[in-house]
Amino acid sequence: MALLIAWVCVAVSIEKALGGQGDGGDLYSENITRILDKLLDGYDNRLRPGFGGAVTEVKTDIYVTSFGPVSDVEMEYTMDVFFRQTWTDERLKFGGPTEILRLNNLMVSKIWTPDTFFRNGKKSIAHNMTTPNKLFRIMQNGTILYTMRLTINADCPMRLVNFPMDGHACPLKFGSYAYPKSEIIYTWKKGPLHSVEVPQESSSLLQYDLIGQTVSSETIKSNTGEYVIMTVYFHLQRKMGYFMIQIYTPCIMTVILSQVSFWINKESVPARTVFGITTVLTMTTLSISARHSLPKVSYATAMDWFIAVCFAFVFSALIEFAAVNYFTNLQTQRAMRKAARAAALAAALSAATVPAEDEIVSHSDSNCNLKKRVNSVTSQADQSPEASIVSNSASQCQPVSAPPPAPPAPPPVGGTSKIDQYSRILFPVAFAGFNLVYWVVYLSKDTMEFFEPTAMHLRNDHQSN
C-alpha cells in the first residue's frame, strides 16, 4: 500500500512539473510579445535615433564569403559579403528575461535603419532565397545588429601601364545616402585591421592574387553638407603564368626563329624570304591576340612595349636579308660589268695584233721563196755542207700564229656576307640585353596602383543624386 502511494506521489509531481514548464514557455512568449509591442508603441521609424540631438554612430564590418571574378575589360570586380551594421537606438531599450531579442527580417521594416549605399557599386543584389538573408538582433541597452548578405559588383579603376606585371587596389566605398556628417558617422567596429575579413578559401582567383586589404575613412564636402565615406581597398597582384605561356614565350621564340635566317646561305633567297615573312605574320597575330583581354586604352602597356620591340627585331631581320640580297646583286653586277669590260679589252687587243701577224707571215713566205730559189740554183752544183745547211733552213720555214686571248674571269659567287656575319652576333646580343633590362626593371618595380578620386568627382556624383 505504501509503495502504491509513493508511485502516485511521483506521478503527480511529474505532471505538475511538466505543466509548469508549459505554462512557463507560454509565459515567456507572452513576455517577449509584450516587450516588442511596447518597443513599437509610439515608435516612428522615419526618425533616426537621437533625432535633433546626438550624432548616430554606425559601426560596420565586412565578412567576404567569395571574391571575384575581376574583369579587366570592364574594370570591375564582384564579391559576395556579409555586410554588418551596428548602432544604438535608445528607444529600443528593454528589460526582461532575455538579453538579446533574435528576430527575423519582418522586424527590419518596422524600425529605423541606416540608408547605407555603395558609392562605386555598379550593381548590388540582396539575396532573398529562400527567405531574405537578413539577421536582426536587439540588445537590452538598445544596441542593434543588422546583417545582410549582398553580392556587390563594384567599379575598380585600373591603370594598365605595367600590365601584366601590374597590381591594383580595388576600392569599395560606402556611406550614408542622405544623412550628412552632422547626423550620421560611420566607424570600423573591430578597428582598421580586423573589420574586413577575407578567408583564404574565399579569394581563389584565376588571374590575380589577393595579397591583402586595407581600410580608411574620409570626409567629403558637397553643397548639401559633409559626408563620411568608408573605403576598403582590396590589393590585387596579377599572375604572370598565363601571359608567359601565351604571349611572352611565343614572342621570344619567334624572334629567335627570325635570327636563324642569318645562318642560311645568302643565295637561298626563297628560304630566307619564307623565314622573314612567316615571323612577321606570327608577330602580327600575337600582337592582335594580346589585346583581346584588355580594354581599349590610349596608352602603351608593358606588354605592348615588349611586343613592339620583338616586332622590330623580326622586321629588322627581314630588312637585313633585303640588304644582303641587294648588296650581293650589286656586287655580282659589278663583277659582271668588270668581266665584260675585260672581255671587250681582250677582243680589241686581239684585233690590233692581226696586221702584225700578217706582216710576219709575209716576211716568212718571202724568205722561204728566196731560199727555195737559192736551193734551185745550187741544186746542179756539188753539194757542200753549207748548201745542206741552207736546205735544212728552208725546210724548217713555217708560218707563225698568235696565241689566243685569255677568257674573262667569272663573277664571284657563294660565300658569307659581312652583314650576316655581324648580324649573327649583334642581333642575339641586343635582344638578350633588352630582355635583361626589361625583366629587371619591371620585376623589381613596385607596380601596385592606387586610385584616389578627388573630392570634386564625389561632389558631382552626390549632386547628381
Curated annotation (Swiss-Prot):
Record-listed 4-aminobutanoate binding positions: R84, T147
Span list, region Disordered: 392-415
GO molecular function, one term: GABA-A receptor activity
Origin: domain of life: Eukaryota
TM annotation in the entry: 244-264, 271-290, 305-325, 425-445
SUPFAM superfamilies in the cross-refs: Neurotransmitter-gated ion-channel transmembrane pore (SSF90112), Nicotinic receptor ligand binding domain-like (SSF63712)
Family to which this protein belongs: Belongs to the ligand-gated ion channel (TC 1.A.9) family. Gamma-aminobutyric acid receptor (TC 1.A.9.5) subfamily. GABRA6 sub-subfamily.
Protein's recorded name: Gamma-aminobutyric acid receptor subunit alpha-6
Organism: Gallus gallus
Gene from which this protein is expressed: GABRA6
